[in-house]
C-alpha cells in the first residue's frame, strides 16, 4: 500500500499560526533528516487522519508532493489531541 500526500510549504510559524491551520482543517508538519534543511509544511487533516488508521502508514515509505517535487519520508512522530480525534502535528524523516 502506498500513500501520497499533497503539501504546501508553511511560511507562518508559531502557536497562533498552527492554531489557525488546525481551525481551517489543516495540520502542521515538518520534514527533516537527510542532507537537506528541515521544511515546515501544511497537510490536509482529513486526508492524513483517514489513512493513519492503517498500520502501513507507520511502516511504509510515504510520498509527499511539495512544490511539484516528490519527497520520500517515513513517519517519525505524531502528536494527537488528548480528548478529540484530531492530529496536532506530524514529524516526517526523509528516507
From Swiss-Prot:
Gene Ontology MF: a single term: structural constituent of ribosome
Keywords, ordered alphabetically: Ribonucleoprotein, Ribosomal protein, RNA-binding, rRNA-binding
GO BP terms, alphabetized: translation
GO cellular component, as recorded: cytosolic large ribosomal subunit
Gene3D superfamilies noted in UniProt: Ribosomal Protein L25, Chain P
Pfam family of the protein (one): Ribosomal_L25p
Positions in coiled-coil regions: none
Ribonucleoprotein keyword on record: yes
Family: Belongs to the bacterial ribosomal protein bL25 family.
Function: This is one of the proteins that binds to the 5S RNA in the ribosome where it forms part of the central protuberance.
Cross-referenced PANTHER family: RIBOSOMAL PROTEIN L25/GLN-TRNA SYNTHETASE, ANTI-CODON-BINDING DOMAIN-CONTAINING PROTEIN, RIBOSOMAL PROTEIN L25_GLN-TRNA SYNTHETASE, ANTI-CODON-BINDING DOMAIN-CONTAINING PROTEIN
Name this protein carries in UniProt: Large ribosomal subunit protein bL25
Organism listed in the record: Haemophilus ducreyi (strain 35000HP / ATCC 700724)
Gene: rplY
Amino acid at each position: 500500500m502506498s500513500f501520497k500526500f499533497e503539501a504546501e510549504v508553511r511560511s507562518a510559524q508559531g502557536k497562533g499560526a498552527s492554531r489557525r491551520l488546525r481551525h481551517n482543517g489543516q495540520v502542521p508538519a515538518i520534514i527533516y533528516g537527510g542532507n537537506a534543511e528541515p521544511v515546515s509544511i501544511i497537510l490536509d487533516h482529513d486526508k492524513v487522519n483517514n489513512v493513519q488508521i492503517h498500520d502501513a502508514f507507520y511502516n511504509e515509505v510515504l510520498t509527499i508532493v511539495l512544490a511539484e517535487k516528490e519527497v520520500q519520508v517515513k513517519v517519525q512522530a505524531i502528536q494527537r489531541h488528548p480528548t478529540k480525534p484530531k492530529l496536532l502535528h506530524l514529524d516526517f524523516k526523509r528516507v
